[in-house]
């Protein structure tokens, strides 16, 4: 209720929910964030306690759907990071030597408590990020639940190889925790990606100093509350809020932090690598994407159209995996374009808490302005806007929010700036192709190589194309169908290393070979 009030929406949410007949449940969760007025200031979570930043400074947290300030974020710096690292060092011995079953049990309790308070987390995520409430409720928060549960159990079943040397010796491998891990996550899928880094690090026996995006800190703050209630030992997880150039870089450059897992922009990833590599830290960097969505004439047409809507505009297009470049084989180009544009034009843009909303608010004013600048650039480069391209004013409490119509642009060259640079918003380009070689040239032309989508009924072609596309993930006749056991990451400037599955457990541990002579 406090979040709603601070978001400027408490006074109208009840009648709106009742009138629409949707299932917004304004429960009172067992989280002090929703019950305590003093929580208007978000706090750091250090050594098992909520605490103000050492410097006492805060900055505003904006609700992107209203444009209004609704909470204050700690402006943490190196002093706060020092406290967090000290707490993590003190906790490491006990946590790393704790039986795996006991560690697993604590992480499962955290998972269960997030699930029990799913509605509160989803509401907070929607208000903080601008995404539709239904998306937060059905995707983001359930995935956070799964992240903790998956790694809590995966760590119990991890095995390592052993080799016998013909009656001479036995070699076996130990995997030991690295110590303290630094985890820095982005604003687009806040709790989803924050927990995807934290969970494997903790499950491997490490302690963590983590920083969520300063744009969307709320659910990370709530996670700290959950960890206290779940009985996570003090100092095992420490959550620092603040700007990347201060708190974030203090984490990256700290000599006692052995590994950095970062998801965000490629330029920031480059800066992190320049800082951390000379210190010989382990690095996992999941960076930008400019993903191709390739549609052949033999596709399942209706499914390709419907799924392309999702892969283009889910979460306002603010997902690194969105297919922002659509390439359609010429025989069905006009048919596909007509069907696609017609459906895009019907997508409702507006209040994220409205159950009928498909496109919510852009996460911040600077990002809102960046997206608009790219729409203008596309027109300057000769692009024709087939639908969208304008800002939206939903009125009411959302009159000052950051809303943009889903936008489809035609007529651009494959190698123009609009098609080469990451926009990260509800903007896609569409163009025809004639041959496999041609579309491979288009698909692989960017500096990025994160994901790609193929639509074809020809299995031979699917295998052939998947092998030649320069990306870390290729979906065939689907999009964002994820198995937590599989590796996740990109090629080229889309990153270094892999997250997900046992690869994440490998990253947060060091291998040690032991050789015993018979």
Regions found by a protein language model. Give the residues of each.
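Short, well-ordered beta-strand elements within core beta-sheets of diverse protein domains
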Residues: 69-76, 90-97, 183, 293-296, ...
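ALDH superfamily catalytic-core signature
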Residues: 259, 267-413, 476
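Rossmann-like NAD(P) dinucleotide-binding subdomain of oxidoreductase/dehydrogenase enzymes
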Residues: 115, 160-303, 433
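Residue-level signal for inorganic ion chemistry
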Residues: 67, 103, 125, 148, ...
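Hydrophobic face of amphipathic alpha-helices that form TPR/SEL1-like repeat modules
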Residues: 35-64, 390
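Intrinsic disorder/low-complexity segments
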Residues: 1-35
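Conserved C-terminal structural/oligomerization subdomain of aldehyde/semialdehyde dehydrogenase
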Residues: 66-72, 257, 294, 348, ...
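Glycine-rich loop-to-alpha-helix module at the N-terminal edge of alpha/beta enzyme cores
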Residues: 68-158, 168
């Amino acid at each position: 209720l406090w979040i709603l009030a601070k978001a400027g929406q408490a006074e109208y949410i009840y009648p709106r929910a009742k009138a629409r007949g949707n299932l917004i449940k304004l429960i009172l969760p067992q989280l002090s964030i929703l019950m305590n007025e003093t929580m208007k200031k978000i706090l750091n979570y250090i050594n098992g306690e909520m605490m103000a930043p050492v410097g006492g400074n805060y900055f505003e947290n904006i609700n992107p759907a209203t444009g209004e300030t609704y909470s204050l974020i700690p402006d943490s710096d190196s002093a706060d990071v020092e406290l967090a690292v000290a707490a993590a060092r003190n906790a490491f011995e006990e946590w790393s030597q704790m039986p795996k079953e006991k560690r697993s049990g604590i992480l499962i309790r955290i998972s269960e408590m997030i699930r029990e308070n799913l509605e509160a987390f989803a509401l907070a995520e929607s208000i903080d990020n601008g995404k539709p409430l239904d998306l937060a409720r059905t995707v983001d928060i359930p995935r956070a639940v799964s992240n903790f549960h998956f790694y809590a159990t995966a760590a119990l079943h991890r095995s390592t190889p052993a080799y016998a040397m013909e009656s001479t010796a036995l070699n076996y491998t130990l995997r030991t925790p690295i110590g303290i891990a630094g985890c820095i996550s982005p604003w687009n899928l806040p709790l989803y990606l924050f927990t995807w880094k934290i969970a494997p690090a903790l499950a491997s026996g490490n302690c963590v100093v983590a920083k969520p995006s300063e744009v969307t800190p709320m659910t990370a703050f709530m996670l700290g509350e959950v960890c206290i209630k779940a009985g996570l030992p003090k100092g095992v997880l420490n959550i620092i809020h603040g700007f990347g150039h201060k708190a974030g870089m203090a984490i990256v450059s700290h000599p006692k932090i052995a590994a950095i897992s970062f998801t965000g922009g490629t330029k920031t990833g480059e800066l992190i690598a320049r800082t951390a590599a000379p210190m010989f830290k382990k690095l996992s960097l999941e960076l930008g994407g400019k993903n191709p969505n390739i549609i052949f004439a033999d596709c399942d047409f209706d499914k390709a159209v419907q799924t392309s809507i999702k892969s283009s505009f889910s979460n306002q297009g603010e997902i690194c995996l969105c297919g922002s470049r659509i390439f359609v084989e010429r025989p069905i180009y006009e048919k596909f374009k007509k069907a696609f544009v017609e459906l895009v034009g019907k997508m409702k843009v507006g209040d994220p808490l409205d159950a009928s909303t498909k496109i919510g608010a852009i996460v911040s004013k600077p990002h809102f302005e960046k997206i608009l600048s790219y729409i203008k650039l596309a027109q300057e480069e000769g692009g024709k806007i087939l639908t969208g391209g304008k800002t939206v004013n939903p009125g009411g409490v959302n009159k000052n929010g950051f809303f943009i119509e889903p936008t489809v642009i035609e007529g651009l060259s494959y190698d123009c700036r609009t098609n080469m640079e990451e926009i990260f918003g509800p903007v896609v380009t569409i163009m025809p192709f004639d041959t496999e070689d041609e579309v491979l040239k288009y698909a692989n032309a960017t500096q990025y190589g994160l994901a790609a989508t193929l639509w074809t009924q020809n299995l031979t072609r699917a295998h052939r194309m998947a092998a030649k596309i320069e990306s870390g993930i290729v979906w065939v006749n689907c999009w964002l169908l994820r198995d937590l056991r599989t590796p996740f990451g990109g090629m080229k400037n889309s990153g270094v290393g892999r997250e997900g599955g046992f690869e994440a457990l490998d990253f947060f541990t060091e291998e040690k070979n032991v050789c015993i002579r018979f």
